[in-house]
Amino acid sequence: MRTTILAARSFNFATKREKIDVKNMRRFICLLLFTASVIQAAAQTKDLSDDSIQSDSAVMHFLTEKGTKIIPNNRVRLLKSGDKKFEDLFDAIRQARHYIHLEYFNFRNDSIASLLFDLLEEKAAEGVKVRALFDAFGNWSNNKPLKKSHLKEIKAKGIDIVKFDPLNFPFINHVFSRDHRKIVIIDGQIAWTGGMNVADYYIEGLPGIGPWRDMHKRIEGPAVDELQQIFLTMWEKATGEIIRGEHYYPNKNDTLFQLNPTSEPVSIAIVDRAPRKSPKLMREVYAQAILEADKKIELINPYFVPTKKVRRALKKAIDKGIEVEIMISTKSDIGFTPDATFHVAHQLMKRGAKVYLFDNGFHHSKIMMVDGKFCTVGSTNLNSRSLNFDYEVNAFIFDETVTGELSEMFKNDKKSSRLMTPEYWKKRSPWRKFVGWFANLLTPVL
């Protein structure tokens, strides 16, 4: 009897425990289902949120997080040729009243530079302060450099001209961190920046290459202050001279900058790459702008051998169905650069990008347009040298009209281009393919 009672109790206990286990299991399953539903709902909400954020807004947010200001209320004029750039610049120099600041990779010792320095001499005689800064390596690397005798003559004109980072022994110490920017500021009111230095070939082209295509822009408004700060910081670095004063930043407290009545206000971010201050910024912004694209990316760059981060971004954009169009030149001023560029472009073509081979001269423009909503124009080449080593500056312009103007130019330049196809690549000689492959191995230092 005792055994029977114990067995019954054990059975009842086991039954109760099983009931408890079943209840716990049910609760656990319910908890899992609830958690899964919450995660799914959150993911759907995130997807909806991400989809609702436009590419331009996303890039603005990214820039702000990186400490780069989005500056509203500017006016931008694109200058699509050397003729237009120098005509516009020279006209403004004639109107200068207080100071003229120039920062270039090089001033080529030719006729357009002579005209520029003669004009600057006239302004210096009127009491306008002229400061000019150029890169020592940029000067040395062009075939018509400014020599000591030329610099002596320029200084005698009343122009304060300075060479950035002179090439002294051991020269290897001066190979990297060059000043590749192109900036002019007049009276703190107007600035120019983009891809053009000072040389005749921006107007006349070069033998064996043909027309030299490039892109520059004129900016009026509060964004000029950012370019002024970049110049004065570099001037201090090169000379030790500290320049301060409110008259160098006339737009700082002017939130109601008066635009031309026919112009719409434009928001601009001045992205400055300085080797120590912001070494990763330019490649991060380029990559993010590519990743945020919703529909289309149009890109022109003369030495197209991007760093890994930018290449990965382009591949991801292609893989998610973004229309990626890249324009590269069949001719170049630097040796085997086209071969390296062709090698990279072919890899992206196989991935799904459209690659246009520009035949009508050399397209030295450094521009990118995204979704017809925003664009960038500047000095930055999409190669390791610009993205990893040199001083560079780009303006990211958040305006559909300016972006549309560049896209229209891109569309027209397709007429002077060939589309890279598998058939075209098959016809390319094995030697040229090998040179491209080998040159690509050197891209970390190109």
Short names for language-model regions:
Residues V38-L446:
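Charged, low-complexity intrinsically disordered terminal segments
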